[in-house]
C-alpha cells in the first residue's frame, strides 16, 4: 500500500500559532492554525478556527484553502510532485507560467494532506494541463526525492503563514498518448500556465529558472537512462 503524506497520529506536544492578515491583506481575517507532526515527520498546517470580523466569506475560503494545501517536512520543504510529459517524438511538454513571459517549467504541484503521490500526480495532471490518467502512460519515477531551495526573495514572510524554504519533490516520467488538442490550461480556477509547447529533451535544463536547473539536470539525466 502506498504511504500517504497525511497527518497520521497526533503528537501530544503539538502547538498552535496565530497568523494575521491572510495573504498580506489588511482586511483579511486572522486564522488560528495547528502545526501537527505525523508519524513520518511531516508537518501539516491546518486551520482549526477563525475570526470573521468584517471580512468576506470568499477571503476566508481562499485563506483556508491555502492553509489546507501546505504539507511541509521537518526541514521546511514543501512536499510535491513534478512531471515530465513526453510525446511520441521524445519531446517534452513545456509550460509558461501565468503572468511571467520568461518563466517556463514542467508541470508540478504540492501534496495535499492525506494524499498519495499518485493521487497528487493525477490531480496536478488535470489541474495544470487538463489531462487524465487515460491520456498518459506511467513510465518511471525518480529513485529519490529531489529538493531545491527558494531564493529568500521568493519565500513567504513568517507573519504571512508557515515558512517554506523550498520544495522536495518526487518526479514522474509520463508518455503522452493522446492528441495535442487534449491539452488544456484552464481546468482550474487559477491556471498555472498560459502557454505550452513541445521542446527537445535537454532544452529545459538551460531554460528553466536558475534555482531549479540542478533539479532538472538530475531528473532528466535519470530518466534518460530509461528511454535510451
Swiss-Prot record:
Renumbered residue ranges of the record's region Unknown: 1-70
Renumbered ranges of motif Nudix box: 109-130
Pfam families attached to this UniProt entry: NUDIX
GO biological process: mRNA catabolic process
The UniProt record lists the keyword Flavoprotein: no
Stored InterPro entries: NUDIX_hydrolase-like_dom_sf, NUDIX_hydrolase_CS, NUDIX_hydrolase_dom, RppH
GO molecular function, one term: mRNA 5'-diphosphatase activity
Keyword Hydrolase: yes
Descriptive protein name: RNA pyrophosphohydrolase
Organism expressing this protein natively: Coxiella burnetii (strain RSA 493 / Nine Mile phase I)
Lineage summary: Bacteria, Pseudomonadati, Pseudomonadota, Gammaproteobacteria, Legionellales
Amino acid at each position: 500500500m502506498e504511504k500517504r503524506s497525511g497527518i497520521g497520529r497526533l503528537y501530544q506536544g503539538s502547538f498552535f500559532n496565530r497568523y494575521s492578515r491572510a495573504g498580506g491583506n489588511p482586511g483579511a481575517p486572522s486564522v488560528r492554525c495547528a502545526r501537527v507532526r505525523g508519524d513520518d515527520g511531516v508537518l501539516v498546517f491546518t486551520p482549526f478556527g477563525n475570526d470573521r470580523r468584517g471580512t468576506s466569506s470568499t477571503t476566508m475560503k481562499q485563506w483556508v484553502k491555502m492553509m489546507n494545501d501546505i504539507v511541509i517536512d521537518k526541514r521546511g520543504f514543501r512536499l510535491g510532485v513534478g512531471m515530465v510529459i513526453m510525446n511520441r517524438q521524445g519531446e517534452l511538454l513545456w509550460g509558461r507560467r501565468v503572468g511571467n513571459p520568461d518563466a517556463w517549467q514542467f508541470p508540478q504541484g504540492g501534496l495535499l494532506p492525506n494524499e498519495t503521490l499518485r493521487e497528487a500526480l493525477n490531480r496536478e495532471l488535470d489541474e495544470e494541463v487538463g489531462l487524465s490518467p487515460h491520456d498518459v502512460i506511467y513510465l518511471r519515477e525518480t529513485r529519490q526525492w529531489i529538493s531545491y531551495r527558494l531564493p529568500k526573495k521568493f519565500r513567504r514572510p513568517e507573519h504571512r503563514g508557515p515558512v517554506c524554504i523550498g520544495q522536495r519533490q518526487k518526479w514522474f516520467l509520463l508518455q503522452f498518448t493522446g492528441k495535442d488538442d487534449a491539452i488544456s490550461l484552464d481546468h482550474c480556477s487559477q491556471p498555472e500556465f498560459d502557454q505550452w509547447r513541445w521542446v527537445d529533451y535537454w532544452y529545459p535544463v538551460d531554460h528553466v529558472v536558475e534555482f531549479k536547473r540542478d533539479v532538472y539536470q538530475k531528473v532528466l539525466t535519470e530518466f534518460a537512462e530509461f528511454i535510451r
